[in-house]
């Protein structure tokens, strides 16, 4: 098999990969996705453990062991619901919200650094919302009593606050006395990012031992986010005994999985946002992913329950929990992993099966961004770095391709001599390659080595919050989204908006990429077979269309990579004294040359 056929095979395989990538993995066109806040007091099917009490929720265990849906509260505006109950305000550089003093839930959080759209006046992202709104989503902590006669704080408990807003410099305490010898205290603290620390304590002033089980839950109700692609998952997620488990919301129906673990964490993950309950990493716990129906409404809940805790008369029991609610910033998740010992916290970002490659690529991009302040330029610098890393390999490949160009006249003679004897032709061709030290597969290598990097970079562009709404220059305002321009209206020069049809919605950067691919082809020898030549001529158009639906940052990478490859290949050809090859027979077509 000669060099041209091998090269065509590599390109066809690449096209198949990219077409499959686009069909199965690339997202369908959709409006930007703000976090979907959901859940009333979420469903609490039987918590793990046959004899242990359940973590409470809106659907509470009934006498038969099933669940009884709570009364649904008609939805109201967020502002009116927040005004109905006393609240302790949350004020940090990244968050604004409040803790409901009736029940003690963290059910009101807005992310100050992120907006739904790139426009500066776009609404800020609302992550958590209280019960009674259209999309409730909240976190709850508490105790379950071993003896049903023991009064524990519930969803209607009115807590007394120590006063002031919860800030990184000012923790707050909530207290409640059950009137029967138990005093409950919740100490809330928050850092300057997205991590809450909740210390629960119970002081027993009664004359008898009390048995309690600590619990924590996160719940959401109604319509939940759905991933439009297989690139990432949204839904319940957790790490149990050092193993990551993540699921789709549909996996929780009718009954979600249960886990036994020491330490770990559990929560809900969206594309860019995460809520996570984090117990003491030495604590043994039972965790559950729940789903129940409240009328016609889906209710989703993740929770964990700690081991039995006995509190002697006069003793105080203390349990520590953490709650993360915010953006999935890789450096921040790594920091919490290192500083707090939260295992695999960075895996909340779904880098997929090329995690080992995608994470370093992002870290390099983030390093460049810290110095130049633009992720588009960072992608270009990353491309140069990748070129330098693969330079010895690519250099060897291009030199081998140059040798193949010099062999074109000899190969043409062999085809003319042994054209009817394919076995003999292949034997003579391989002998020729061996004699001159040429590699017929050399042309495949520059294309093949790009595929893993291409996929990993796409994953980085698509799932990292840092790339969300990251601008480049000119018309590119979001590197994670496709090029917004279209050749139909001359890239915005004509005063109308073309329809959002992928067949015609091809922007400027994909066309630039196609041009660079066409120029790169001109440095390669023209195939002797007219059909092969037509296939090569069609490839830039095929790739232009395919990549027009991909992230603009990825198209910029591909175009810039082509330009660097053209420069490198031209310099090597010049040093080797090889001109752009023509088909045997000079300017004649291969078919005519064969007749002369």
Go through each PLM region and give its residues.
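Membrane-protein biogenesis/insertion across secretory and organellar systems
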Residues: 1-388, 496, 579-596
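Membrane-interface amphipathic helices and adjacent TM-edge segments
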Residues: 182, 200, 314, 389-454, ...
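Hydrophobic transmembrane alpha-helical segments of multi-pass transport and channel proteins
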Residues: 503, 507, 511, 547-551, ...
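Transmembrane helix interruption/hinge and helix-loop junction motifs
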Residues: 372-375, 545-555
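Hydrophobic alpha-helical membrane segments of integral membrane proteins
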Residues: 9-10, 553-560
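Transmembrane alpha-helical segments that form the functional core of multipass membrane systems
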Residues: 346-417, 424, 430-434, 470-474, ...
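Conserved catalytic motifs of ABC-family nucleotide-binding domains
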Residues: 459-514
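Core hydrophobic alpha-helical membrane-spanning segments
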Residues: 8-22, 454-457, 511-516, 541-542
């Amino acid at each position: 098999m000669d060099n041209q056929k091998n090269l065509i095979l590599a390109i066809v395989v690449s096209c198949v990969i990219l077409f499959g990538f686009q069909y199965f993995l690339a997202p369908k066109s959709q409006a930007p996705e703000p976090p979907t806040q959901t859940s009333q007091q979420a469903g609490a099917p039987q918590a793990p453990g046959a004899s242990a009490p359940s973590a409470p929720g809106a659907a509470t265990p009934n006498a038969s062991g099933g669940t009884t849906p709570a009364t649904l509260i008609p939805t109201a505006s967020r502002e009116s619901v927040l005004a109905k109950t006393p609240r302790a305000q949350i004020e940090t550089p990244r968050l604004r919200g409040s803790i409901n003093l009736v029940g003690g839930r963290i059910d009101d959080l807005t992310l100050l650094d992120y907006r739904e759209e790139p426009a500066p006046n776009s609404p800020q992202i609302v992550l958590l919302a209280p019960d009674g709104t259209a999309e409730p989503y909240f976190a709850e902590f508490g105790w379950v009593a071993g003896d049903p006669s023991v009064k524990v704080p519930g969803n209607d408990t009115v807590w007394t606050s120590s006063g002031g807003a919860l800030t990184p410099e000012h923790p707050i305490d909530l207290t409640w006395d059950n009137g029967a010898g138990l005093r409950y205290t919740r100490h809330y603290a928050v850092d300057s990012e997205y991590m809450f620390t909740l210390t629960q304590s119970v002081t027993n002033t009664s004359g008898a031992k009390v048995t309690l089980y600590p619990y924590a839950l996160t719940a959401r109700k109604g319509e939940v986010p759905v991933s439009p692609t297989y690139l990432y998952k949204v839904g319940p997620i957790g790490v149990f005994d050092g193993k990551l488990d993540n699921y789709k919301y549909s996996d929780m129906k009718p009954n979600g999985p249960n886990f036994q673990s020491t330490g770990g964490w559990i929560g809900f993950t969206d594309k860019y946002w995460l809520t996570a309950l984090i117990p003491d990493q030495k604590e043994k716990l039972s965790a559950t992913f729940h789903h129940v129906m409240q009328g016609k409404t889906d209710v989703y809940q993740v929770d964990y329950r700690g081991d039995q805790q006995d509190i002697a008369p006069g003793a105080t029991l203390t349990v520590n929990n953490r709650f993360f609610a915010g953006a999935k910033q890789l450096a921040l998740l790594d920091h919490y992993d290192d500083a707090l010992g939260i295992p695999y916290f960075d895996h909340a970002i779904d880098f997929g099966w090329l995690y080992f490659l995608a994470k370093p690529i992002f870290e390099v991009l983030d390093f460049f961004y810290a110095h130049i302040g633009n992720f588009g330029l960072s992608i270009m610098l990353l491309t140069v770095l990748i070129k330098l890393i693969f330079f010895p390999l690519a250099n060897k490949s291009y030199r081998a391709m140059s040798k193949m160009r010099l062999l074109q006249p000899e190969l043409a003679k062999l085809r003319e001599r042994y054209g009817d004897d394919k076995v003999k032709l292949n034997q003579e061709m391989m002998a020729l390659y061996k004699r001159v030290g040429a590699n017929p597969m050399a042309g495949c290598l520059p294309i093949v080595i790009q595929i893993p990097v291409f996929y990993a970079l796409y994953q980085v562009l698509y799932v990292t919050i840092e790339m969300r709404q990251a601008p480049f220059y000119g018309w590119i305002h979001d590197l994670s989204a496709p090029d917004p321009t279209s050749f139909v209206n001359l890239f915005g020069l004509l005063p109308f908006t073309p329809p959002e049809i992928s067949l015609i919605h091809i922007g400027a950067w994909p066309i630039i990429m196609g041009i660079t691919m066409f120029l790169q082809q001109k440095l390669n020898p023209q195939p002797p077979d007219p059909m092969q030549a037509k296939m090569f001529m069609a490839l830039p158009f095929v790739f232009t269309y395919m990549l027009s639906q991909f992230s603009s940052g990825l198209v910029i990478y591909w175009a810039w990579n082509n330009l660097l490859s053209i420069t490198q290949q031209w310099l090597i050809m010049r040093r080797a004294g090889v001109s752009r090859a023509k088909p045997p027979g000079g300017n004649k077509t291969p078919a005519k040359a064969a007749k002369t």
